[in-house]
Amino acid sequence: MAAKDVIFGGEARARMVEGVNILANAVKVTLGPKGRNVVLERSFGAPTVTKDGVSVAKEIELKDKLQNMGAQMVKEVASKTSDNAGDGTTTATVLAQAIVREGMKYVAAGMNPMDLKRGIDKAVHALVAELKKASKATTTSKEIAQVGSISANSDESIGTIIANAMDKVGKEGVITVEDGKSLDNELDVVEGMQFDRGYLSPYFINNPEKQAALLDNPFVLLFDKKISNIRDLLPTLEQVAKAGRPLLIIAEEVDGEALATLVVNTIRGILKVVAVKAPGFGDRRKAMLEDIAILTGGKVIAEEVGLTLEKVTLADLGQAKRVEVGKENTTIIDGAGAAGDIEARVKQIRIQIEEATSDYDREKLQERVAKLAGGVALIKVGAATEVEMKEKKARVEDALHATRAAVEEGIVAGGGVALLRAKQAAGEIKGDNADQDAGIKLVLKAIEAPLREIVYNAGGEASVVVNAVLAGSGNYGFNAANDTYGDMIEMGILDPTKVTRTALQNAASVASLMLTTECMVAEAPKDEAAGGGMPGGMGGMGGMGGMDM
């Protein structure tokens, strides 16, 4: 086992604070409407330009082991805030640095770190309660657009496109962000259920302009196995042909004789039919087939439930108003499923979302809910270069998370004002002793830090602005974008309550851990000198005389 350095007390904390400052100073230049960019080196390709606090934090690894421990702990603040609220990472980092800085002064003065921590917790608890009281529900599309704009660094076009997407697919709908092809941002909305499987043969295309197969008022056959033998399908095809309607077949696979026969019948115009593969894999495929069955009012033909292809009747088939099948996607519009059944299915999936342990599973389940409930909106981000595209896409994703947080817990005045008003509303918070009072006092001072940093990045005098804002009341604050004072909500400078709350709680949590640290253990630096040079020569091999050949 490698040798370790063990450092105690003030020296350990001082080195940790150095690491905190290096990381926080790099992150906080991005805060506010006049915050600057940070350029991140990439091992290959163009560098990444970002104004996203958590992206900057994740890149930082320090050479000094003890400084690095401090930096990594603050990195945890940023990434936790990003995971929980989706935004507010820079605010959280600034708050953590401010609490650590203030707190270290008290620890150095001989105060009890555990009592300081209890004081910090009391102050945070009181401030969070006030933030929740001040929170206002987001009701209008305009407010959602404003939240998105602020989160995307005052880019109104991003806020507007997110608000439009939420209008179209509802607040629960899935909104995905993709690279666009043009210079402008575009919004595509897919109504109904879309899944990423296209036609199995281009001969099914009946609309050459769209390069797609369009079926009006079709039956939908759902089968969870492979179809290779046309004999299995014949009874179903005959019933559908008699009804004079088209047929969409969704199965694990359709190939061989079965696919060839379907193609021939389509070309000859005997039957309008399209075959596609079922979406997903394994258990997820079964679940998605069941979703489609409920949406279209049909059944999944599976041997497990005693149904076989030969015995299928029209009552077992699903129905839809319209189906569009492209090369890569299939969209089912206006399925004939009962609204009550769809609602029950959505409820069931929501319970699974709450129980899901991995982010990937949760995301896939949320997609299924959206496909059943409303639809999917696609925001295509436009930019001139790839570097700009990456930066803009990250901002759109941040703004999307922020608007979701605003819908969830409401909004408060932005620009660091909500924290100052919470401090005023909380009144006098009392600790059990002088050291706890000091912990409370340091939090109440530290929460000025986000506003101070916004003003500093805008080139203003922080103390003057903070005093002016404290002298006001309600939503009165400072708009750093144009150096004016006024009502923050009216000016459209809003923060989601969840983002502000999470930033404060996470910052205080990690800062408290640092203040109560008394010892640090790190791997000792390797002694470079010890490995230098080759060992001395091999000292002559003596005479080898007498060895007559």
UniProtKB/Swiss-Prot annotation:
Sequence intervals crossing the membrane: none
SUPFAM superfamilies membership: GroEL apical domain-like, GroEL equatorial domain-like, GroEL-intermediate domain like
Domain of life: Bacteria
Molecular-function annotations in GO: ATP binding; ATP-dependent protein folding chaperone; isomerase activity; unfolded protein binding
Any matching Pfam family: Cpn60_TCP1
UniProt cross-references to CDD domains, sorted A to Z: GroEL
Record's signal peptide: none
Function: Together with its co-chaperonin GroES, plays an essential role in assisting protein folding. The GroEL-GroES system forms a nano-cage that allows encapsulation of the non-native substrate proteins and provides a physical environment optimized to promote and accelerate protein folding.
Family under the similarity heading: Belongs to the chaperonin (HSP60) family.
NCBIfam families hit by this protein: GroEL, PRK00013.1, PRK12849.1, PRK12850.1, PRK12851.1
Protein name from the UniProt record: Chaperonin GroEL
Gene responsible for this protein: groEL
